[in-house]
Amino acid sequence: MARGVRLNGSWYCSRECLDAAARLSLAQPAGAPAGPAPLPPLRLGVLLRHQRVITGGQLQAALDEQRFSGLKLGTQLRALGMASSEAVLRALAVQSGVSYLSSLDLARVRGVCPLPVATVRALGLVPFDFDPFERRVSVAITAPLTRAAVRAMAMLTQWTVEPFLVDDPVWSVALSSYRPLESADGPAWAATAASARELADHVAAVAADGHPVTMRHAAYDQRTWVRLESSRETRDVIVRPEGDVACLVQPTAH
């Protein structure tokens, strides 16, 4: 840091000042609040009955069987042959207020979006359509919809994030097949775990050779997600609580 670093429009001449600024930024609220809690969604069984997919008797039989199997209701109905995968997925999408996809062309998740693989895996959102001009991305996600993950991605990237529900097997294959688009503005770095004390080191690295850095952060999964951007590169840093062990290669459970 012989020449200092410009972070979010301000100049910091020393490592100590940069560290203090990064910590102060993390202490600020991570964007707009989630807003008031929505009304509880209709239960899946009620929706399937309303859509005339199952009868009341079939629902009761599935609930009775569920007590022994421990399966989710949708999985139980499919196992009993009472509802198709698409019927269950459609009802789950209505329940969440989003669209759904019964299948996904794997070519759409390769080289389409610049998000790093580790960020995608940790958030559990698989990009399959990206418009850099409209700053809009479509992502595949499984039920139940994790709105906190969607908000975190939107806050980190400043993109409009449109979630689409898919079945668990479709999501798993899409996740393992995802490859990022190589950005013309520089490499998309995989997410890196760090403590709050180490964050300034990452800021200094992204700012190498005098490149100004923009820092944004979002709270998700009991951690703070930080995106550092310069004209040189983009880096995602997950600031974990003290004592937390870094594990960034496992997909988020849904």
Which residues fall in each region the model found?
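Extracellular/lumenal glycan-associated surfaces
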Residues: 42-54, 72-84
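Polyanionic, low-complexity intrinsically disordered segments
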Residues: 80-156, 192-226, 231-233
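Short linker/helix segments within small regulatory modules
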Residues: 1-11
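Short, low-order "capping/linker" segments at domain edges
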Residues: 173-190
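Short hydrophobic alpha-helical runs that function as membrane-insertion/retention elements
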Residues: 159-167
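Short, recurring structural edge motifs at helix starts
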Residues: 29-38, 49, 59-67
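Short metal-binding segments enriched for Cys and/or His
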Residues: 10-32
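Extended, charged low-complexity segments
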Residues: 229-254
